[in-house]
Amino acid sequence: RDVAPSRGLGDVYKRQPQARLTVMDLVKGACAERIYPVGRLDRNTTGVLLLTNDGDLASKLTHPKYLKKKIYHVYLDKNLTKADMDQIAAGIQLEDGEIHADAISYSDEVKRDQVGIEIHSGKNRIVRRIFESLGYKVVKLDRVFFAGLTKKGLRRGEWRYLTEQEVNFLRMGSFE
């Protein structure tokens, strides 16, 4: 069984902040099988996340050799300079190795504190670490695309079952 929730902190966490609800609470009762997240989003990141009970599919979507695309909308504490954007595109040296953005662009050419970044890496907190290494604070981070899946039509905290066609495309590796 494959489920795609639109992960959000918002109302779910505000209702009972001491409970520290997780994405698994959002999909409780979605299916009889045990499902688990494919990849990860840290507690302060919102966006599309896939849950499945198919270990082979999870491996295909998370192993670096399969190069599955992730696109994030990044909100920064200040405008990103063109020089820093070029440096991110060329590659940034982090403590666990060099990371390259596959693509990066301003979300708005006038207000340059929001960018879209495409990466294939699944390293922990990689997008936040890229910007922090250059002196930026990530104010908000939203994953808008993962392996061909988007959160289109889903509000924060909502989820849906994948269509049979989506599952087949994922299994065949047809999505980036």
Residue ranges and their predicted role:
Residues D11, R20, A32, N44, ...:
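Short, charged/polar surface micro-motifs in flexible loops or helix N-caps
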